[in-house]
Amino acid sequence: MTYRDFIGRLKENGKLVEIQQPVSPIFEASRIAKKTKGPVLFHNVSGSKVIMNLLGSRDELSSMLGVPKEEIIKKLSEVSPEGEVRLVPGSPTLEVIESEVDLTKLPILTHFEKDGAPYITAGIVVSEYEGVMNASIHRLMLVGKDKLAARLVPPRHTYLLHKKAAEKGETLPVAIVLGCDPTIIYATSTRVPAGKEFEYAAALRGTPVEVFECSNGIKVPHSEIILEGYIDTKERVDEGPFVDITGTYDMVRKEPVIHITRIIHRKDPIYHGILPAGPEHLLMMGVPYEPRIYRAVGEVTTVKNVVLTEGGCCYLHAVVQIEKQTEGDAKNAIMAAFAAHTSLKHVVVVDEDINIFDPNDVEFAIATRVKGDMDILTITNVRGSSLDPRGASDGTTTKVGIDATKVLIEKENFERAIIPEE
């Protein structure tokens, strides 16, 4: 399914809000996207089309994957990154070629009052060095007509490729993809073996991913917009402030500069923007960890489902549903979840009769099945998330696991009343 096909399906299903009147890229588009929550297509942001909240809910992920919402994580946990990638000679992305680079002509958004600059938030940075390729989403701060500052997180793959090239005095060629097949957007948000992002996307959608070669040799999928360039060897600038998944400002750091040398795009391209700390940002950060937790818990007990909750920024809080068979199962599940996602701060384990997508049902389990001195596991001075405002300066935190499952020998005490159907 193409990017435009997916947008068309949203429209056909009545799930796309369209804004025809002019909208400012400074705060206004973000303000509307935050209020709308669902997919919203702006037809005139500084004369350009912009879509936000494209994959902003599990309903959109369900549509993308072709499975019910409750089966998303089971599906993702079963897919291996072994799909087919095909190199093709041309692309609709080549409809317009701009050698005179001016990034300010793009509808790059300013989202919050203290943002360091306008930010590209949905750019997939594709890089390759010495035969090793990577594709991943990075926040990109506008610092000039042909320059972007990229937040490269150590020790992730783009950071390592740039480090390796810089140590040899060489620039790292990159191509920044904006607006492509949603399965590719998801695949490049997750953790797969180096260079397997496009293969994973192909496996997810069940059809090959076509790529074409940019002028700098980087191979990219068909997209709305491609920014070709390179990451400078030594040049660094202040990057930030920027709002991260907790809705608070991340710190300002010295980060590498990407020089853009050419822009190619579709006619009348649809720019993709992700609202920082918005629903799409949360899902793209969190959902890729759910299959990892699912598989890890499955090694120690019978796992039924996993969710990283919206209230926990889809990153810091998890609810794990198991089929409990022994009294140790829930605590084993807690430890497995923490091992699978080291940024996880709090985890709740529940039984099969609890709807993990309903916060009230999860709270009911905690209220009626937890005895504080027996069912709460506290682990101090362990690695946490750099995104947690309450974490220590050395990156450590305290983690809490809650066993909100029934006591097996007293199961009848926890039976929930049912009104029979007629």
Swiss-Prot record:
Cofactor(s) annotated in UniProt: prenylated FMN; Mn(2+)
InterPro entries: UbiD, UbiD-like_C, UbiD-like_N, UbiD_Rift_dom
GO biological process entries: isoprenoid biosynthetic process
A cellular-component GO term for this protein: cytoplasm
EC number(s) on file: 4.1.1.126
SUPFAM superfamilies associated with the record: FMN-binding split barrel, UbiD C-terminal domain-like
Pathway: Isoprenoid biosynthesis; isopentenyl diphosphate biosynthesis via mevalonate pathway
Metal-binding listed as a keyword: yes
EC class (word): lyase
Record NCBIfam families: UbiD family decarboxylase
Family according to the record: Belongs to the UbiD family.
Name of this protein: Anhydromevalonate phosphate decarboxylase
